[in-house]
């Protein structure tokens, strides 16, 4: 049942967890739209670094030496913090040997991603050395590296107690007063633990009778100097943020016997472990639930701390991803937690594991003294408890069985600062920014899973996203973020390399209104030079105009609202469509169009279509003519962006009158017309004459065709076959005469032609006959006396027999002899068909 109702409950909580009315932004939801969107092509002053490797996820900034140390796969880099592109950088190659990679692959690990030396830890060890640890193909190693020479030492330390085996596992670590505090999954079995090494008293968490950590994935750790301002002599504490699996929850989701929850844990820096109980184990370990928005669907992705050196002002920002069990909706939430709230939870009631019910429940019994999990204070020292080894066994037994607190840690004001839909944040970092007016604001940079950076300022109970920046051309996850206030730069670590770009781009804002609407704590309008400047670069900061809280005050009396846009003219015919372009500079601005300075135009009104790219006027009429102004309305301010003068013409204008032609041009025109008319008349006469001749020819040809008759015969001769073509003027031998004449001799002169193939040599060619007359008595041109090849292997000679002059026999014999000579070896068909004629 709960599985079906969770999507509805998720939507309900999303709507109901909405802040009240606010002057800064709409209150209908927690989602915030970035004011500006800056694509990769629009970026300026961005710097890239990429070596011959990948996975540049470990970053360490050394402000004093102006160096940025980078840990990658099989390499370490020392870059200039001023410009990471500086070619004078140093590099250490720290690869796993082929033998180690082979052993890793034999253990079933991926030799394409896992069986390498991924540098996961990089911290300052002392004044002269750094300390680095790498997975080293599932055999972790650590090394102390000289900061000056930046050369890999010849000796290494075993890292199985300090570094994860798996490069994909969560890891966090700190070096505090020479001691190494790390939290990850250790050993090849991937056991989650919080450990202290390189210390006279090495410590770890308890595993029996119950695990203090259950399938934990660690995200972040930080040292809070609580001893500086403590009135009771309290100890410094290390806080760890992680996700773990909760078994047997007693919440209203009892049907879900196991789910992952966010936790915060803490240990005391001066913890030495127990003397008999909890030997080499933490005696100050406590953990509590961390809640942001919807507990059952929260995954902790990143945490950053601000003012960790002053515990009274220390607070944390955590980013969660909210995902339903079907992953039909994805969002990210940002919550703020005050250190005072966390301290109050750790001094509250405890939980205990109830074996009968197999779940955690609130502990209702008595709590021994000194309070379990507390650090050694001046009060305890006065009572003889100078260290954790002096604590009573009853206290240590209680700590062993009650590591979990009953109350959860809730965000400041009980709700998230931001709920961003369709975005998955992966990392965040923040800094304090003081403004010329005096207030200090928290500025956050949030990295996404697809390579974008969101820059946001915290304003009371909400957040204003100043801009979203696409820092990678190809989508990839942002793995690490580091801020350098001295260099005014943000460093981004990702799989493909390291990026550096400025914390602000104030020069992008061209007017006073645009500068204050951005609400960037780094930017202010300087009226003396009429420019939006970085506040830290201005000598007299008090003269800068800023309004971070509301973002709409300060420019009323200024003349720096920007020059008015030029007036553009448009002229169209009546009934046509016309587009008046107008791009809004801000995602938060609303387009407003005014006609003749007063009439407000709305979408769908009188043929107007208001879009994000301008105003479309459809089916223009005469009343659409006028002056159009495009304004951007944002946060109560109105700015003119474009101005147009539109004229609608009633009809197509008449063509302009032509100038009178000159006498010479008129004469040339008349001659051309005369030639055209003459050619047309002659063409018509030729057509009539040709038609008459064709008609006469057809009549005569029809009468002559009816008086002729051809017959195809066959003569049998020894050794071959013959083709005979007979006209009405003679007959072929061996057949009856079907014509009007009874005479015939069987020769060529008788009107019958026989073609007999054979091997006989042709007679020598006689002298050429006189040419035939050009025209016969019937007026038709004489038929050619030439041999024509028909279908098959037979040849015929077409000629007239009556009332004509036959072609000379010598000419025919000569041509026939030549053709037959070429084909005498060709087999002729014995049976002829009619298609051979």
Curated annotation (Swiss-Prot):
UniProt subunit comment: Interacts with PLXNB2.
PROSITE patterns noted in UniProt: IG_LIKE, SEMA
Subcellular location as annotated: Cell membrane
Keyword Plastid appears in the UniProt entry: no
Topological region Extracellular: 18-673
Intrachain S-S bonds: 104-115, 133-142, 268-375, 292-335, 506-523, 515-532, 582-630
Described function: Cell surface receptor for PLXNB2. May play a role in axon guidance.
Span list, region Disordered: 721-776
Start and end residues of each Ig-like C2-type domain: 565-647
Primary localization class, coarse: membrane
Tissue-by-tissue expression: Brain, spinal cord, and several sensory organs as well as specific populations of projection neurons.
GO BP: cell differentiation; nervous system development; semaphorin-plexin signaling pathway
Cytoplasmic compartment segments: 695-837
Domain Sema: from-to ranges: 35-503
InterPro entries listed in its UniProt record: Ig-like_dom, Ig-like_dom_sf, Ig-like_fold, Ig_sub, Plexin_repeat, PSI, Semap_dom, Semap_dom_sf
Disruption phenotype: No visible phenotype.
Domain PSI: 505-556
Keyword vocabulary terms for this entry: Cell membrane, Developmental protein, Differentiation, Disulfide bond, Glycoprotein, Immunoglobulin domain, Membrane, Neurogenesis, Phosphoprotein, Signal, Transmembrane, Transmembrane helix
Annotated protein name in UniProt: Semaphorin-4G
Record-stated family: Belongs to the semaphorin family.
Location of Phosphoserine modifications: 794, 836
Signal sequence coordinates: 1-17
């Amino acid at each position: 049942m709960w599985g079906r109702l969770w999507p509805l409950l998720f939507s309900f909580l999303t709507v109901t967890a909405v802040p009240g009315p606010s002057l800064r932004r709409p209150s209908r939801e927690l989602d915030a739209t970035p004011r500006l969107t800056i694509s990769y092509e629009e970026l300026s002053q961005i710097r890239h670094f990429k070596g011959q490797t990948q996975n540049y996820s470990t970053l360490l900034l050394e402000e004093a030496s102006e160096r940025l140390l980078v840990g990658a796969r099989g390499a370490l880099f020392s870059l200039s913090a001023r410009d990471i592109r500086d070619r004078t950088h140093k590099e250490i190659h720290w690869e796993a040997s082929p033998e180690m990679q082979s052993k890793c692959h034999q253990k079933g690990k991926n030799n394409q991603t896992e069986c390498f030396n991924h540098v996961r830890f990089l911290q300052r060890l002392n004044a002269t050395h750094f300390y680095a640890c790498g997975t080293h193909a599932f055999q972790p190693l650590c090394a102390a590296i000289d900061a000056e020479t930046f050369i890999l030492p010849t000796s290494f330390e075993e890292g199985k107690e300090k570094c994860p085996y798996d490069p994909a596992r969560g890891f966090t670590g700190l070096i505090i007063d020479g001691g190494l505090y790390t939290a990850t999954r250790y050993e090849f079995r991937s056991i989650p633990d919080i450990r202290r090494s390189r210390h006279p008293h090495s410590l770890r968490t308890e595993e029996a009778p119950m695990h203090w950590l259950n399938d934990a994935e660690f995200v972040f750790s930080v040292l809070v100097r609580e001893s500086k301002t403590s009135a009771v002599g309290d100890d410094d504490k290390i806080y760890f943020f992680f996700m773990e699996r909760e078994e047997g929850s007693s919440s209203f989701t009892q049907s879900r016997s196991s789910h992952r929850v966010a936790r915060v844990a803490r240990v005391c820096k001066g913890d030495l472990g127990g003397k008999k109980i909890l030997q080499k184990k933490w005696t100050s370990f406590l953990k509590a639930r961390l809640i942001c928005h919807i507990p059952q669907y929260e995954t902790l992705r990143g945490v950053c701390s601000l003012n960790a050196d002053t515990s009274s002002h220390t607070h944390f920002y955590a980013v969660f991803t909210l995902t339903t069990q079907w992953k039909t909706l994805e969002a990210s939430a940002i919550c703020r937690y005050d250190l005072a709230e966390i301290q109050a939870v750790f001094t509250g009631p405890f939980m205990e594991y109830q074996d009968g019910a197999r779940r955690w429940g609130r502990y209702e019994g008595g709590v021994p003294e000194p309070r379990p999990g507390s650090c050694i204070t001046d009060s305890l020292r006065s009572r003889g408890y100078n260290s954790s080894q002096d604590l009573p066994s009853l206290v240590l037994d209680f700590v062993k069985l009650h590591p979990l607190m009953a109350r959860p840690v809730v965000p400041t004001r009980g709700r998230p600062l931001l709920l961003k839909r369709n975005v998955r944040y992966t990392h965040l970092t923040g800094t304090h920014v003081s403004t010329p007016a005096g207030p200090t604001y928290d500025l956050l940079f949030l990295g996404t899973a697809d390579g974008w950076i969101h820059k946001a300022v915290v304003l009371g109970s909400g957040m204003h996203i100043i801009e979203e920046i696409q820092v990678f051309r190809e989508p990839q996850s942002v793995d690490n973020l580091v801020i350098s206030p001295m260099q005014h730069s943000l460093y981004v670590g990702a799989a493909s390399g390291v990026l550096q770009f400025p914390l602000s781009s104030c020069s992008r804002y061209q007017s006073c209104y645009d500068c204050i609407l951005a609400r960037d704590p780094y930017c202010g309008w300087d009226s003396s030079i009429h420019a939006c400047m970085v506040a830290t670069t201005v000598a007299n900061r008090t003269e800068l105009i800023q309004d971070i809280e509301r973002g709409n005050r300060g420019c009323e009396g200024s003349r720096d609202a920007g020059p008015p846009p030029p007036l553009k003219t448009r002229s169209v015919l009546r009934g046509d469509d016309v587009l008046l372009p107008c791009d809004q500079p801000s995602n938060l601005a609303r387009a407003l169009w005014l006609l003749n300075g007063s009439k407000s135009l709305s979408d769908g009104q009188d043929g107007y279509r208001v879009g994000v790219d301008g105003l479309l006027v459809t089916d223009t009429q005469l009343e659409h003519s006028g002056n159009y102004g495009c304004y951007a309305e944002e946060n109560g301010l109105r700015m003119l962006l474009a101005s147009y003068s539109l004229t609608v013409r009633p009809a197509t204008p008449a063509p302009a009158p032509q100038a009178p032609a000159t006498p010479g041009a008129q004469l040339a025109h008349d001659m051309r017309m005369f030639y055209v008319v003459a050619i047309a008349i002659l063409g018509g006469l030729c057509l009539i004459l040709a038609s008459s001749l064709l008609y006469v020819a057809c009549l005569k040809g029809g009468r002559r065709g009816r008086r002729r008759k051809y017959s195809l015969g066959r003569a049998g001769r020894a050794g071959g076959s013959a083709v005979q073509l007979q006209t009405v003027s003679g007959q072929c031998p061996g057949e009856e005469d079907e014509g009007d004449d009874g005479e015939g001799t069987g020769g060529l002169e008788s009107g019958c032609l026989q073609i007999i193939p054979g091997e006989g040599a042709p007679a020598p060619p006689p002298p050429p006959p006189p040419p035939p007359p050009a025209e016969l008595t019937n007026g038709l041109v004489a038929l050619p006396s030439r041999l024509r090849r028909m279908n098959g292997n037979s040849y015929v000679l077409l000629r007239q027999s009556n009332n004509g002059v036959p072609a000379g026999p010598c000419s025919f014999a000569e041509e026939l002899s030549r053709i037959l000579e070429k084909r005498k070896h060709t087999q002729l068909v014995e049976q002829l068909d009619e298609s051979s004629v």
